[in-house]
Curated annotation (Swiss-Prot):
Name of this chain's protein: Type III pantothenate kinase
HAMAP family according to UniProt: Pantothen_kinase_3 (MF_01274)
Binding-site residues for substrate, renumbered to this chain: 107-110, 184
Family indicated by similarity: Belongs to the type III pantothenate kinase family.
Species this chain originates from: Pelotomaculum thermopropionicum (strain DSM 13744 / JCM 10971 / SI)
Length: 256
């Protein structure tokens, strides 16, 4: 079995694979001040809850956009699994040709998504990942990572609204019954939800003009399912796309 870590700015998503099958997945809050022992204790509890044993893990793969946590997770893996993790970064074999100005600056999570997306759906392809930031990644028919767009995530946008508008309350992000809100909460929910759907669809439509109208559009991330309900461009939601990509990257590097 292999253990994979997808470390984002808000959450750490973990998965355990037996071959190509995802047998367990968990979500923890990202905290760069937690120690390797604190994460280790959490993992012990999660493994036990899922009926798994930590000694079953034969390899670990890490993708992180929070550099301070890299060392913490390396220590975690060495102490609790007696393994050195494969950390996604420069020099790691992905199978993709990275066609951007500076390949070293692209986020590991975006490359991992592109690996899984192209393997599973082919290209041309647009992958929309709803995280702390909303990322749009373009992959060509030949499996080239072409770049993309980065926009503020829905949580960042709503937090900014609450922080700067003293009279506006915090609201839950849901699909409203109508775009015409009849009170402050409903009006905010309509603006947040449909504004975000419109942003996603407009960026995707412009990408498809450049990539070709036969471009597939896949979404992943925490709010993918909610936004896809109303989106005119998202064709499929794959909640575990990043975890699948980490497994694929492990397999491609294990064959070296």
């Amino acid at each position: 079995m292999i253990l994979v870590f997808d470390v984002g700015n808000t959450n750490i998503v973990l998965g355990v694979f037996s071959g190509s099958r995802l047998v367990a997945n968990w979500r923890l809050s990202t905290d760069r001040y937690r120690t390797s022992d604190e994460y280790g204790i959490m993992l012990r509890e999660l493994f036990a809850f899922s009926g798994l044993e930590m000694k079953q893990i034969k390899a670990v793969v890490v993708s992180t956009v929070v550099p301070p946590l890299t060392f913490t997770l390396e220590r975690l893996c060495q102490k609790y699994f007696n393994l050195t993790p494969l950390v996604v970064g420069p020099g790691i074999k992905t199978g993709l040709s990275i066609k951007i100005d500076n390949p070293r600056e692209v986020g590991a999570d975006r490359i991992v998504n592109a690996v899984a997306g192209y393997e599973q759906y082919g290209g041309p392809l647009v992958i929309v990942d709803f995280g702390t930031a909303t990322t749009f990644c373009a992959v060509s028919a030949r499996g080239e990572y072409l770049g993309g767009a980065i926009a503020p995530g829905i949580s960042i946008s709503t937090e900014a609204l609450f922080a700067r508008a003293a009279k506006l309350p915090r609201v839950e992000v849901v699909k409203p019954l109508s775009v015409i809100g009849r009170n402050t909460v409903a009006s905010m929910q309509a603006g947040i939800f449909y504004g975000f759907v419109g942003q996603v669809d407009e960026i995707v439509k412009r990408m498809k003009k450049e990539l070709g109208e036969n471009t597939r559009v896949i979404a992943t991330g925490g709010l993918a399912g909610l936004i896809a309900q109303e989106s005119a461009t998202i064709e499929q939601v794959d909640p575990f796309l990043t975890l699948k990509g980490l497994r694929l990257i492990y397999e491609r590097n294990a064959q070296r």
